[in-house]
Regions:
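Bacterial N-terminal signal peptides
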Residues: 9-19
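N-terminal presequence-like segments and the immediate start of the first folded domain
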Residues: 5-7, 20-95, 101-145
Length: 145
């Protein structure tokens, strides 16, 4: 009797897990894209899109600068601002920032150029010092969620 009950419970559990997996596979994620006004809404040569919106969350690809100066940092954050505005968002909607730089000391020194865009409402942030970015001459890249 115990064996029959165990087999029945096992069968029901397997059936439930199988159906849950099938349902998850049929659940299409609706994505909206924006890529600098590009008609395809993506860069097919590099294989990325600047902004992907899933439900009410924006995933913003990195914007880069060739120099870690107040001017370079400002250009990066202006590009990110344009990316956010493509879906009606601002820096006050940003919850996570990932910053990659080949010159961390300069980034720390000129951080005020970055902070002005957040207007005192800062996101969770991770800053990483790296030896190189995708664009060989880039020294700063910032991505947002």
């Amino acid at each position: 009797m115990k064996n029959k009950i165990f087999n029945m419970v096992f069968f029901v559990l397997c059936f439930f897990l199988l159906n849950t997996n099938i349902a998850a596979q049929n659940n299409d994620v609706k994505k909206e894209k924006w890529h600098w006004g590009n008609a395809l809404q993506q860069d097919t040569s590099a294989g990325y899109v600047q902004v992907v919106k899933v439900e009410n969350v924006l995933y913003v690809s990195g914007a880069v600068a060739r120099d870690v100066t107040p001017e370079g940092i400002t250009r990066v954050y202006q590009a990110l601002e344009r990316s956010l505005k493509s879906f009606g968002a601002t820096f006050q909607n940003v919850v996570k920032e990932n910053l990659y730089t080949t010159d961390m000391e300069a980034m720390k020194r000129y951080n005020d150029a970055r902070k002005v865009f957040y207007k005192g409402d800062f996101p969770a942030a991770t800053w990483l010092g790296v030896s190189r970015l995708f664009m060989a001459d880039a020294k700063l890249e910032v991505e947002l969620i």
